[in-house]
């Protein structure tokens, strides 16, 4: 893998991991056109580490606050104002458990998915973003309930399918469940932390030759690219969520899905 390819793949990961356009779908398409259909396992793992670092950087204060609340709860010194944060922690645990079950059920199928299906899932993601942008609640919830957590965890599990955006599906699910926009965005990205960690652990365990096909400079270049692009992508997306503009990504995903469908089904065999 060249340094240029590493930077491009890192940028794609950084953009698509957070923007509601499906990182796995875009990486699969980029790898296909780069004629590199087996991404080196260590490179893939470290791209996830870089995007995890980006989300932890953006939400550093919030994460520290949640750990502080959890610490007080463990030593039985919780404060009355900790109630909402304790519910957030419980919601993350519930959602992650649901995600794990769905992810395990879909794991083998996702590994062998026909690349021609990915554009169809891009279109589905686009339609989901349009539908969620039309939601108008008279009174949107400011706090995550366990039911909302379970629904959002289900959506995140389905988001392992290439072409189905994890962030798009989780934010949309939270909105459908009645959560307000800012809280839906926050919950989605806090929920991504255990999901990315789990993916990291699974990939490490299943790896045979971590160093195959990639040089140290390519690894570093890809990681830096993924972190920088991911950081600014996440900041940008949080502003769009606040303003209810997620629907804009549908105007990219639907034409992309249609164009790739025509290519794969009509010209690529």
Swiss-Prot record:
Transmembrane regions: 1-21, 39-59, 86-106, 112-132, 144-164, 184-204, 210-230, 249-269
Subcellular localization, as worded in the UniProt entry: Cell inner membrane
InterPro entries on file: UppP
GO molecular function, one term: undecaprenyl-diphosphatase activity
Recorded GO CC terms: plasma membrane
A biological process term (GO) from this entry: cell wall organization
Main location: membrane
Catalysed transformations (reactions): di-trans,octa-cis-undecaprenyl diphosphate + H2O = di-trans,octa-cis-undecaprenyl phosphate + phosphate + H(+)
Positions of disulphide bridges: none
Main EC class the enzyme belongs to: hydrolase
Keyword vocabulary terms for this entry: Antibiotic resistance, Cell inner membrane, Cell membrane, Cell shape, Cell wall biogenesis/degradation, Hydrolase, Membrane, Peptidoglycan synthesis, Transmembrane, Transmembrane helix
UniProt-listed Enzyme Commission number(s): 3.6.1.27
Pfam families assigned to the protein according to its UniProt record, in alphabetical order: BacA
Record membrane topology: Multi-pass membrane protein
Family statement drawn from the similarity comment of this UniProt entry: Belongs to the UppP family.
Summary of the function given for this chain in its UniProt record: Catalyzes the dephosphorylation of undecaprenyl diphosphate (UPP). Confers resistance to bacitracin.
Other noteworthy facts: Bacitracin is thought to be involved in the inhibition of peptidoglycan synthesis by sequestering undecaprenyl diphosphate, thereby reducing the pool of lipid carrier available.
Family matches, as PANTHER family: UNDECAPRENYL-DIPHOSPHATASE
Protein name: Undecaprenyl-diphosphatase
The organism of origin for this protein: Treponema denticola (strain ATCC 35405 / DSM 14222 / CIP 103919 / JCM 8153 / KCTC 15104)
């Amino acid at each position: 893998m060249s340094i240029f390819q590493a930077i491009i793949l890192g940028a794609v990961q950084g953009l698509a991991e957070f923007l509601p356009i499906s990182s796995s779908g875009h990486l699969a398409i980029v790898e296909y056109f780069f004629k590199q259909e087996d991404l080196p396992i260590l490179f893939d793992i470290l791209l996830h580490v870089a995007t995890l670092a980006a989300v932890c950087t953006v939400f550093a204060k919030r994460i520290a606050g949640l750990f502080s609340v959890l610490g007080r709860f463990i030593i039985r010194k919780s404060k009355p104002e900790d109630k909402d944060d304790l519910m957030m922690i419980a919601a993350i645990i519930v959602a992650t458990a649901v995600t794990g079950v769905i992810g395990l059920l879909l794991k083998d199928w996702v590994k062998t998915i026909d690349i021609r299906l990915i554009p169809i899932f891009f279109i589905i993601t686009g339609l989901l973003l349009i539908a969620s942008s039309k939601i108008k609640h008279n009174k949107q919830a400011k706090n995550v309930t366990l039911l909302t957590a379970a629904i959002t965890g289900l959506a995140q599990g389905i988001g392992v399918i290439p072409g189905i955006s994890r962030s798009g599906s989780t934010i949309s699910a939270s909105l459908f469940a009645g959560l307000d926009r800012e809280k839906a965005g926050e919950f989605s990205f806090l929920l991504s932390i255990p999901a990315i960690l789990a993916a990291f652990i699974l990939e490490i365990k299943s790896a045979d030759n971590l160093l195959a096909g990639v040089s140290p400079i390519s690894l570093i270049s890809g990681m830096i690219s993924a972190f920088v692009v991911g950081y600014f992508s996440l900041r940008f997306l949080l502003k769009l969520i606040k303003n209810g503009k997620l629907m804009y990504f549908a105007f990219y995903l639907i034409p992309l899905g249609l164009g790739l469908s025509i290519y794969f089904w009509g010209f690529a065999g």
